[in-house]
From Swiss-Prot:
The keyword Nucleotide-binding does not apply. It comes from Corynebacterium diphtheriae (strain ATCC 700971 / NCTC 13129 / Biotype gravis). Transmembrane segments: none annotated. It is an enzyme of class 4 (lyase). Belongs to the type-II 3-dehydroquinase family. Pathway: Metabolic intermediate biosynthesis; chorismate biosynthesis; chorismate from D-erythrose 4-phosphate and phosphoenolpyruvate: step 3/7. This is 3-dehydroquinate dehydratase.
Amino acid sequence: MNVVILNGPNLDRLGKRQPEIYGSTTLADVELELFRLAGQLGVDVECKQSNYEGELIDWIHCAADAGNPVIINPGGLTHTSVALRDALAEISDGPGFIEVHISNIHAREEFRHHSYLSPIATGVIAGLGTIGYELALRYVVSTLNS
């Protein structure tokens, strides 16, 4: 099984940008831990990050065509992108996707409280830091193996 893990705009800045909110862990650290965990769980993960909405959508289309589940931290696109939601709807109708946020978006500015993606997500993990990615991967593997 292959699980696609996508990170949206500004997540390449983890460990540098607003560490008081997002912590000091880098995206490379997160990906390294996900590769390690995937090996333990017997799955392959494909980690990608882009600051460009269209590139994320292209990757979602590839995941849909391959029948792969997606774990996504859409960053700020969470609150603005109908196009991303439309692409993820195809994943939602198939293997499903988990929406992950490092910070608790509901405890932050009002404009961050709304997600265009949450209503069609299999699940949402927010506010648990970078361990949220690991929890999402464990969930995806457990549901696909059952």
